[in-house]
Amino acid sequence: RMPLFFKWTVACAIVLLVIGVGYNFYQSHNEANLVYREVCAVRGEKLLVLLPDGSRVWLNADSKLTYPEQFAKYNRNVTLEGEAYFEIAENKKSPFQVLAENVKIQVTGTCFNVKAYASDKVIKTTLDEGSINIGHVQSRRPMQQMLPGQTAVYEKRSNVIKIKTDRYHDDASSWKSNRLIFRNASLKEVLTTLSRHFDIEITVKNEKIASFTYDFVCKGNDLNYVLEVMQSITPVSFKKISEYTYTVE
């Protein structure tokens, strides 16, 4: 179990040897035997990953990043499961590409957040600086360009990507500074975030409260305070069963 006070740590990676075709990256024949690093941030943990090209990636809780030990000459490809904030070193001759399920994001140098948890219904990409192109992994259609302050939402069920200007785009990376921000978030969304953030399990004992929504901002280092805030907003009651287990009704 990880402590509830998060400290950024430079990640130690597990080195994986990936041989053959069919891997998530689009590899040419001379890339087939690349050695890959897999970095995992468990629930209740955040990591800072330093990439071979000098780029930096902040990995949120319950997330995994896979990347080559050394990038290929003309591309820099990584895969993401979960959430991460990317600060990419500029190199126009070697584009940087993030693959997150059925979404691909291409950049040459910029800062952006990607939220791509497998259990979520959507994948969200929010751009802070520079510009990026976003599209479907296996689509031949032209990729869509994003500008700072925009968020792209990929709906998994419809397989559609929609880009919009987001007045709250700074919220996307608030987790880096250990802040929890919820805007019209359902109870399920809030509990899912808390479970990842604090490495706990919360069981809903009364389905009637599932329709409750929440709007609040707070520091992410005190679970009890967060639960008190939720209880002040809606008529819910949290009960601690064990150190890492709670119920709500």
Which residues does each PLM region occupy?
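A residue-level detector for the "anchor" residue at the start of short, highly conserved motifs
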Residues: 3-249
